[in-house]
């Protein structure tokens, strides 16, 4: 239940933020919570995944968003929504 609420909160936050310039730290905070709640473990090959399978989609979403935001940062560590939207839609 806690995971579902967290995922819903993330989706609302991202939806609200995609229409404007975002601060990277806000999304990082949300995704750090996501990663913590997933109870990450590594498989034999060193790949990370969530021990709780219900959390795996949230973890993938956060991982993809953080990767996308790294590619879209400007000199002030701000991320532009258009770049995030474009890269998320192609991944």
From Swiss-Prot:
GO terms for molecular function: toxin activity. Residues 1-21 form the signal peptide. The keyword Signal applies. This is Teretoxin Tan22.13. It is found in: Secreted. The cysteine framework is XXII (C-C-C-C-C-C-C-C). Expressed by the venom duct. The lineage of its organism: Eukaryota, Metazoa, Spiralia, Lophotrochozoa, Mollusca. Its main location: secreted. Residues 22-24 form a propeptide. GO terms for cellular component: extracellular region. Belongs to the teretoxin C (TC) superfamily. The keyword Hydrolase does not apply. Keywords: Disulfide bond, Secreted, Signal, Toxin. Contains 4 disulfide bonds.
């Amino acid at each position: 239940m806690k995971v579902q609420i967290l995922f819903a909160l993330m989706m609302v936050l991202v939806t609200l933020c995609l229409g404007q310039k975002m601060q990277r730290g806000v999304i990082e905070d949300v995704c750090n919570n996501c990663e913590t709640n997933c109870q990450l473990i590594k498989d034999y090959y060193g790949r990370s995944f969530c021990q709780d399978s219900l959390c795996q989609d949230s973890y993938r979403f956060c991982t993809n968003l953080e990767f996308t935001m790294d590619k879209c940062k400007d000199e002030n560590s701000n991320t532009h929504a258009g770049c995030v939207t474009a890269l998320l839609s192609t991944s």
